[in-house]
């Protein structure tokens, strides 16, 4: 039974797992890959709203990629490798922007990825933004991410003269 588990589950995982990052190449032994999180000031904005400056980090570095010419018929597996400097640890924060003059949506919440740590990772390994937003919404018990892809808009408190249909549409967003 254990052998079937190893063959059926672990073998495909091992085959399709991304290769580890490469730190040095034989052709350039004096060069090494590097990737680090650099402090930046990020401007968060939204149409019709006041922008906000926040402190964040950006991933910056030089990671190795290479492609060795192929042969036909192919005698060995393709020799292509790609690493990119990208986040390995981040959190998502809500940044609230004020939107003066917009009575319907006086504030807009933007989800902003705050990068904590970076490293050379296999290209195409980016974490899905929708998946990350889904986790944020699950953790904060707010509206679902499908209702506001990328930001959540706040309406002002309902006035007494508002009809129930108007205040019920709070989760709808206008793009």
From Swiss-Prot:
Subcellular localization: Secreted
Segments of this protein annotated with the region Disordered: 144-175
BP GO annotations: animal organ morphogenesis; determination of dorsal identity; sequestering of BMP from receptor via BMP binding
UniProt xrefs under Pfam families: DAN
Gene3D superfamilies linked: Cystine-knot cytokines
Keyword field: Cytokine, Disulfide bond, Secreted, Signal, Tumor suppressor
Source species, domain of life: Eukaryota
Domain CTCK, chain residue ranges per copy: 35-124
Any one Gene Ontology molecular-function term assigned to this protein's record: receptor ligand activity
Family, as annotated: Belongs to the DAN family.
UniProt function note: May act as a tumor suppressor. Cytokine that has an axial patterning activity. Acts like bone morpho-genetic protein (BMP) antagonist in embryonic explants. Blocks the bmp2 activity.
Assembly behavior: Interacts with bmp2; the interaction is blocked in presence of nog.
Protein's recorded name: Neuroblastoma suppressor of tumorigenicity 1
């Amino acid at each position: 039974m254990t052998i079937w588990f190893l063959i059926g589950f672990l073998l495909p995982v091992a085959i399709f797992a991304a290769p580890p990052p490469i730190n040095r190449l034989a052709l350039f032994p004096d060069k090494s890959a590097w990737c680090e999180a650099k402090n930046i000031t990020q401007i968060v904005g939204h149409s019709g709203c006041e922008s906000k400056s926040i402190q964040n980090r950006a991933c910056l570095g030089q990671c190795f990629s290479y492609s060795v010419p192929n042969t036909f018929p192919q005698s060995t597996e393709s020799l292509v490798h790609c690493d990119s400097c990208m986040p390995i640890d981040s959190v998502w924060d809500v940044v609230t922007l004020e939107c003066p003059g917009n009575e319907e949506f006086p504030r807009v919440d933007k989800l902003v990825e705050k990068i904590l740590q970076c490293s050379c990772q296999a290209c195409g390994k980016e974490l899905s933004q929708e998946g990350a937003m889904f986790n944020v919404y699950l953790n904060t018990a707010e509206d679902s991410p499908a209702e506001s892809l990328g930001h959540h808009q706040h309406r002002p408190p309902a006035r007494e003269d508002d009809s129930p249909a108007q205040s019920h549409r709070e989760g709808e967003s206008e793009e």
